[in-house]
């Protein structure tokens, strides 16, 4: 049976940046002990004959074949641009200073 001291609860609360009252400390002490006892029960279960499961459902990825297809022509992509330069969109600079 797991025992959690008041000091451990206060330490956990401090690490979590929580301010808890003495009553809450007692309540959290009981809650943590219950959780740890349950975890110990699970730990004692005999799983030696159980095959490891990575997912509860038998799922497989369904992927399509990756095929390259032609995109739209550059002239069509740039057709409605306000400004272009050397076959590219030209936009106002948003970075100023030495790194620009």
Swiss-Prot record:
Entry-linked InterPro entries: Asp/Glu-ADT_sf_sub_c, GatC
Organism domain of life: Bacteria
EC number: 6.3.5.-
Record keywords, A-Z: ATP-binding, Ligase, Nucleotide-binding, Protein biosynthesis
Assembly and binders: Heterotrimer of A, B and C subunits.
Biological role: Allows the formation of correctly charged Asn-tRNA(Asn) or Gln-tRNA(Gln) through the transamidation of misacylated Asp-tRNA(Asn) or Glu-tRNA(Gln) in organisms which lack either or both of asparaginyl-tRNA or glutaminyl-tRNA synthetases. The reaction takes place in the presence of glutamine and ATP through an activated phospho-Asp-tRNA(Asn) or phospho-Glu-tRNA(Gln).
Protein name: Aspartyl/glutamyl-tRNA(Asn/Gln) amidotransferase subunit C
Species: Staphylococcus carnosus (strain TM300)
């Amino acid at each position: 049976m797991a025992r959690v001291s008041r000091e451990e609860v206060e330490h956990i609360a401090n690490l979590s940046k929580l301010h808890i009252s003495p009553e809450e400390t007692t309540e959290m002490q009981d809650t943590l002990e219950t959780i740890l006892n349950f975890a110990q029960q699970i730990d004692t279960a005999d799983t030696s004959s159980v095959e490891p499961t990575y997912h509860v459902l038998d799922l497989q990825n369904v992927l399509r074949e990756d095929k390259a297809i032609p995109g739209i022509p550059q002239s069509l992509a740039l057709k409605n641009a306000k400004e272009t330069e050397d076959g590219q969109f030209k936009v106002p600079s948003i970075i100023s200073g030495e790194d620009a």
